[in-house]
Amino acid sequence: MIDPHIFRAYDIRGKAGSQLTEDACRQIGAAFGEVLIEKYGKEHPHPTVAVGRDARTHSLDFETALIDGLSSAGCKVLRIGQTPSPVNYFTICNAKLDAGVQITASHNPKEDNGIKLQLRNAEAYSGEDLQDLRRRIETFPSPLGERG
């Protein structure tokens, strides 16, 4: 079960490894991918998402898991690597992508990590949308994304 407390007003954030895990990132990616398919699927059957990360030691693993989730939902991913959040926003707008995800906890302690989600034109996916995403994840069969 995903920790509901990581879903904040403007982003998803928590202690890396306990509150925010690779499995949680995979579930978040899959759920956000479903949202994008529902929102943009008639225009683009496979919405394209820019995914970047900060320099935290766990960000690469979280990025990989989140990309697994997005891909499992049917999204295409443009992996932009280690970048600050504004580069992700620029990429979404400049390349006219459907969405973006940045793995970052910004100014928070190094033990934390987080996820910022954006739609087209780098519009923040936040507020009640994040709570809807959480509820969607809570309906997923458990565990999602385990590999055999």
Q: Whereabouts are the PLM-identified features?
A:
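Gly/Ser-rich phosphate-binding catalytic loop and adjacent alpha/beta segment
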Residues: I2, A9, G14-G148
